């Protein structure tokens, strides 16, 4: 167990064998739910000089610097509210629940690999993170957004590498879920600027997105891909700015006109080059 006297509770509990690791942040008797903390599926193929497939836990994860990184950049208390019917009072009461969030191994690894590579190579590169259903994609996106928003490529740099982090979804429901998740991790007022429908947003229209990008409102901007076509031709162009764009459900949202307009809004030069490449590819296809 990794414990904290400040929180007066254990932060995480590990169940460790010679082949697999499982973790939970809450012990609840027979109802305890453990999650895999393996490097691969059931740690198949994992090799170690010690002979134990699980040695990465104490050799890598439980190191002093790693624990400090987990406490500073990953762990948080997630607060959820749910309305439940109170039969005695004959009305719905709001129940508040708290849960400690601790990253699973693949989430921690994904964030570290991306941040390390971006710090090494700088802006302008493309990455793909593959997540299966139920593997914590929203938290991975959230951790990555916050790490990139405060990333300095070199120790002597005066400014962060990226001017803004844009988290883009392709559906309203996903936007609301992502917005709520990212706000849970926020500790600074004005750090997050959300554009969408419903409550808890700073803007509702595409013009709000335009202003947020032009005036750098919020280190992290959350929006939907459908907002970009309406501003692609009117947004001001800042050639010296850099954006990190994190796209949820990229397999379904990164094709067609919406994606092209998003690239145009954020980088006119890149979009023009891409359009030329697309036209050339279409011409070749017609010849065939």
Report each predicted region and the residues it spans:
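Short, solvent-exposed coil/turn elements at secondary-structure transition points
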Residues: 19, 198-201, 228
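Conserved RecA-like ASCE ATPase "motif II neighborhood" in helicase/translocase motors
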Residues: 207, 211-249, 253-267, 271-272, ...
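ATP-dependent helicase/translocase motor core
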Residues: 1-164, 173, 177-188, 219, ...
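Short, functionally important structural connectors and interaction interfaces within domains
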Residues: 94-95, 201, 258
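Generic enzyme active-site microenvironment
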Residues: 15, 168, 246-247
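Conserved nucleic-acid-binding Ia/Ib motif block in the N-terminal RecA-like helicase ATPase lobe
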Residues: 164-168, 172-221
């Amino acid at each position: 167990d990794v414990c904290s006297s400040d929180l007066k509770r254990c932060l995480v509990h590990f169940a460790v064998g010679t082949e697999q690791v499982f973790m939970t942040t809450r012990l609840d008797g027979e109802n305890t739910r453990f999650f895999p903390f393996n490097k691969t599926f059931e740690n198949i193929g994992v090799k170690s000089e010690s002979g134990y497939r699980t040695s990465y836990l104490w050799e890598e994860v439980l190191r002093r610097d790693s624990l400090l990184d987990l406490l500073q950049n990953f762990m948080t208390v997630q607060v959820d509210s749910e309305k439940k019917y109170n039969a005695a009072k004959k009305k719905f009461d709001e129940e508040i629940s708290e849960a400690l969030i601790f990253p699973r191994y693949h989430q921690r690894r994904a964030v570290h690999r991306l941040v390390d590579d971006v710090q090494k190579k700088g802006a302008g590169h493309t990455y793909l993170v593959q997540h299966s259903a139920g593997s914590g994609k929203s938290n991975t996106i959230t951790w990555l957004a916050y790490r990139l928003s405060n990333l300095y490529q070199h120790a002597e740099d005066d400014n962060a590498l990226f001017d803004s982090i844009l988290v883009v979804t392709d559906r309203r429901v996903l936007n609301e879920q992502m917005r709520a998740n990212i706000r849970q991790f926020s500790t600074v007022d004005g750090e997050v600027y959300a554009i969408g429908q419903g409550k808890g947003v700073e803007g509702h229209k595409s013009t709000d997105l335009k202003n947020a990008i032009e005036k750098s409102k919020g280190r992290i901007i959350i929006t939907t891909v459908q907002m970009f076509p309406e501003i692609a031709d009117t947004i001001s162009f800042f050639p010296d700015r850099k954006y990190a764009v994190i796209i949820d459900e990229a397999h379904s949202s990164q094709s067609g006109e919406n994606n092209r307009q998003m690239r145009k809004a954020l980088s006119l030069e890149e979009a023009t080059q891409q359009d030329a490449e697309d036209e050339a590819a279409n011409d070749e296809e017609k010849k065939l």
